[in-house]
Amino acid sequence: MNIAAKPPLTIRLCGPRGFCAGVDRAIQIVVLALKSYGAPVYVRHEIVHNRYVVEGLEAKGAVFVEELDEIPAEHRAQPVVFSAHGVPKSVPEDAVSRNLFYLDATCPLVSKVHKQAMRHNRLGRHVVLIGHAGHPEVIGTMGQLPEGSVSLIETIEDADAYIPVDADNLGYVTQTTLSVDDTAGVIARLQERFPNLTAPAADSICYATTNRQEVVKQAAPGCDLFIIVGAPNSSNSKRLVEVALRAGAKKSILVQRAAELDWDEIGAISTLGLSAGASAPEVIVNEIIEAFRARFDARVELAETVQETENFLVNRELRSIELTAADMAFVNG
């Protein structure tokens, strides 16, 4: 009996991909808090936008809440962790008023944007925030300043329609996970309309967002399908889908697990692009590769632009706790 040969497939695996330093740090903070203080450790909002990560932490004893008033009175001696996206100033103030011990897992690069926005405000500038309405990072950044101090711009059309109170006294910052190209277009339009618009001291879009978009741009041309591993509420993952399509992939999709793959829809392909958003764990990337290997004679080739070496320290209270490979195996494999 002849067994049909598997069709050949080239998988262009992008590097860098997956966890950035800020996401890695945030997950480590929850894991170390559980080791240090025991379960439950409460986390306000999803620590990162990935259900696999959230469920893995829940299995270890983390409890996710949307607001601090959801924490039972009998557990108020337990720590609460703020997510990597950052929070408005009112949240730590609320924690203090409730006598809660909190650990802030805000990405240091998001904290930098907060400081840039506050500096604009301190110098008397109205802050223009380029970002997506409703995203936790945008809510957190806007919440650093008094109400009315920030105007949100999402698109070039918004930039065209924006009418400031004082056009000569504006400063901008951006969400860290935006499309690099789209954001450049919005900034250019704002600068065209408001020549005195003050830029932040450093680019607000983070290194990981930029790096992941650049390698997807390089790998996408000629791909029959480009898969981005990530959650539907992950801003940076959704931007990667858009980047792949613009760069020449015939089709690009966002998936969270291999079980979501629709093989009838995928059909006959010969070249697959594969990357992962900054909150997607490597174990899922491997899961996707193995799913394709089960159906194709797959050859993986690495498409790499840069190697990332960034590393952010966890909170001082947790630095004496040992973090082992076993502690992080649920996301790293």
Curated annotation (Swiss-Prot):
It comes from Rhizobium leguminosarum bv. trifolii (strain WSM2304). It comes from the Bacteria. The active site is at E137. Its cofactor is [4Fe-4S] cluster. InterPro entries: LytB/IspH. [4Fe-4S] cluster binds at C20, C107, C206. It is an enzyme of class 1 (oxidoreductase). Keywords: 4Fe-4S, Iron, Iron-sulfur, Isoprene biosynthesis, Metal-binding, Oxidoreductase. (2E)-4-hydroxy-3-methylbut-2-enyl diphosphate binds at H49, H85, H135, T176, S234, S235, N236, S279. The keyword Isomerase does not apply. Binds 1 [4Fe-4S] cluster per subunit. Its EC number is 1.17.7.4. PANTHER family: 4-HYDROXY-3-METHYLBUT-2-ENYL DIPHOSPHATE REDUCTASE. NCBIfam families: ispH_lytB, PRK01045.1-4. Isopentenyl diphosphate binds at H49, H85, H135, S234, S235, N236, S279. Dimethylallyl diphosphate binds at H49, H85, H135, S234, S235, N236, S279. GO terms for molecular function: 4 iron, 4 sulfur cluster binding; 4-hydroxy-3-methylbut-2-enyl diphosphate reductase activity; metal ion binding. Belongs to the IspH family. Catalyzes the conversion of 1-hydroxy-2-methyl-2-(E)-butenyl 4-diphosphate (HMBPP) into a mixture of isopentenyl diphosphate (IPP) and dimethylallyl diphosphate (DMAPP). Acts in the terminal step of the DOXP/MEP pathway for isoprenoid precursor biosynthesis. Gene3D superfamilies: 3.40.50.11270, 4-hydroxy-3-methylbut-2-enyl diphosphate reductase, catalytic domain. It catalyses: isopentenyl diphosphate + 2 oxidized [2Fe-2S]-[ferredoxin] + H2O = (2E)-4-hydroxy-3-methylbut-2-enyl diphosphate + 2 reduced [2Fe-2S]-[ferredoxin] + 2 H(+); dimethylallyl diphosphate + 2 oxidized [2Fe-2S]-[ferredoxin] + H2O = (2E)-4-hydroxy-3-methylbut-2-enyl diphosphate + 2 reduced [2Fe-2S]-[ferredoxin] + 2 H(+). This is 4-hydroxy-3-methylbut-2-enyl diphosphate reductase. One of its GO terms (biological process) is isopentenyl diphosphate biosynthetic process, methylerythritol 4-phosphate pathway. Pathway: Isoprenoid biosynthesis; dimethylallyl diphosphate biosynthesis; dimethylallyl diphosphate from (2E)-4-hydroxy-3-methylbutenyl diphosphate: step 1/1; Isoprenoid biosynthesis; isopentenyl diphosphate biosynthesis via DXP pathway; isopentenyl diphosphate from 1-deoxy-D-xylulose 5-phosphate: step 6/6.
